[in-house]
Structure formats: structure tokens, C-alpha cells
Amino acid sequence: MKGLKNVKVYIKNVGIVKTNIGIENGRIAYIGNEENIEPIFETDGIVVPGFIDEHIHGAGGADAMDGTVEALQTISEFLAREGTTGFLATTMTQSPENITNALKAVKKVREKGEYKGAEVLGVHLEGPFISPKHVGAQPLEYVATPDAELFDKYNEASGNSIKIVTLAPEVEGGLGLVKHLSNIGVVA
């Protein structure tokens, strides 16, 4: 069996131990001191679970706002090389058309379910429901008043994949949208 030899691993109720990990079909099949492990590569390192990135706009020269499956795949492959196994594709305040295109691309990728890298776990919708007084790097002309109906249209376009929304609760409609998001299990 191929795997990792002499690596440090945290095991629940035991602690950090030096052990071997056998891998079959891309999955952990064995953890223990069996010596019959053919090393994938020489290491004396630490094995940790894959990281989850809940706010990433892009990587590898691609951006979630490119609105294409190819861009999301580029991000996915880049993140996997860095130890990230799942991520939320993060949008930004842009035209409704650009946001919708980005969300539709996430829907396509998630429906297909085939990943060569990190899994697209959903969407972090950053804006457009932000404060016009505090836009930061977001373009003011695309800031929208917090609105549950508009959010629902975006969520439908994403295949109900929106998990987190960055918004301004202090603006008119903000608390109403927060309540709506809370009711459907979306973090605001």
C-alpha cells in the first residue's frame, strides 16, 4: 500500500502520534504502524486536515467574478496545491448581470460535482448589500439596498449555494435581510 511514513498526526482521544498513513484510491485507508507502506515521497512532516477558505476571490490568475467554470476550476486546482480542500467562491459588488453570471458558474460546477482540486462548497456573496458610506474597494454605482427578493434571485442563480453574505445591517432593509438569511440558514 502506498502512503506516508513516519508522519505526525493528531488522533482524537490519543493526541499527536508519529505513525504511517496508507492511501488507496486517493483516500486514507489505514493509520497505524504497519511497516508495509511504500512512501509516496520522503517526509518526516505533520499531516493536517485540508483547509477551508471561506473568502477567496481568486487564485492562479482567475477570479470568481470571471463567471466561468474554467475560472473556478483554475482556482480549485491552485488552492489544492496549497492545502485547501474546499472554498467559498467570493463575489464582489458588481453589476447584477456580472454577479448572476458568477453565481451560475458556481451552480454548474457544483451540479457537475467533479473536482480536480479543492471543492467549491458554495458562495460568499460579498455585497452588493453594503453601505454606500463604506464601500472600500467596491464600486459605489453597484451598491444595492438590502433586499430579500433580490437575494433570493441571486441564491436561485447559484443553485441555493450562497452560504455567507457580507452586508451592512445598519442601512435601511439591512436587519430585514439579516432575519431572512437567518431563517434560511445563511450566515450574515
Set out the residue ranges of the language-model regions:
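Residue-level signal for inorganic ion chemistry
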Residues: 7, 26, 55, 79, ...
